[in-house]
A protein has these predicted regions:
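Polar, acidic low-complexity tracts enriched in Ser/Thr/Gln/Glu with frequent Gly/Pro and Thr-Pro motifs
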Residues: 45-237
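Positively biased amphipathic helices and basic secretion/translocation or surface-docking motifs
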Residues: 8, 12-56, 69, 233
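N-terminal acidic, proline/glycine-rich, low-complexity intrinsically disordered segments
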Residues: 1-8
Length: 237
């Protein structure tokens, strides 16, 4: 009786004061379940980007090992070659990082930063191609030597860039699935620009054509088209 009376008193007091009776203690099963839980392993900031980069580098590495390399490679100025590798390589690394790695304290990549980095990378390599492309007289090849027009040589190199970029795009899209609810097209643009820059880096070593027109229309345009493809693939209404 006393137990029932206390329950009744608690209910009456709760209604009068607006304070309900205290909840019952947790069951033994609930306590055991809580004690057995383990912290969820969070995504690393660089792990996914590193995996995508490694997957994308496999193809170019195989091509460089088996060759052939451009016939004028030995005659190119060392400073120019270092600058070209640094610029195309930085465009690849920075674009990929902006698409895959959130800023410190964030959970998801920042679309605005990704698009800005990608556009800056494309502008820099375009200016380098326009203003600093070099050839080696007597060693650099002209499209006519293969029976090609300038347009045909550019289409060939755009195709090479596309083959490299598609690997980065597929690997990146898999890694980023369901992680970019908004701004996906801008992240996709950065991802495509990264793939295009990696293709351009490969062409530094294997493309025999060294005219400014070819490098701009074949290599840089290839990167731009890869960025557009990435934006379209990740476009979300």
């Amino acid at each position: 009786m006393s137990g029932g009376g206390n329950d009744f008193d608690d209910r009456v007091l709760g209604r009068a004061t607006g304070v309900d009776a205290p909840p019952p203690p947790p069951s033994a099963e609930l306590l055991r379940a809580v004690e057995s839980t383990k912290p969820v392993r969070t995504r690393t900031r660089f792990g996914a980007a590193a995996v995508v980069a490694l997957v994308g580098l496999v193809g170019p590495a195989i091509v460089l090992v088996h060759g052939p390399l451009r016939r004028d490679l030995a005659g190119l100025p060392a400073a120019w070659l270092i600058a070209a590798v640094a610029l195309w390589g930085s465009a690849f690394a920075l674009s990929l990082a902006s698409a895959m790695i959130p800023r410190r304290g964030d959970v998801l990549p920042a679309p605005s930063r990704a698009s800005m980095v990608a556009m800056a990378a494309m502008v820099v390599v375009a200016l380098f191609a326009l203003l600093a492309t070099v050839d080696v007289p007597g060693q650099s090849m002209l499209p006519a030597e293969r029976g090609w027009t300038l347009f045909e040589s550019c289409v060939h190199c755009i195709g090479t860039v596309a083959k490299v970029a598609v690997v980065i795009l597929i690997a990146g899209l898999i890694a980023l699935r369901r992680l970019v609810p908004v701004g996906g097209s801008r992240v996709g643009m950065a991802l495509g620009a990264a793939g295009g820059a990696l293709g351009g880096l490969l062409l530094v070593f294997i493309c025999p054509f060294a005219s400014t027109a070819h490098v701009v229309l074949g290599h840089v345009v290839g990167m731009v088209l890869a960025a557009i493809a990435g934006a379209l693939l990740m476009f979300r209404k």
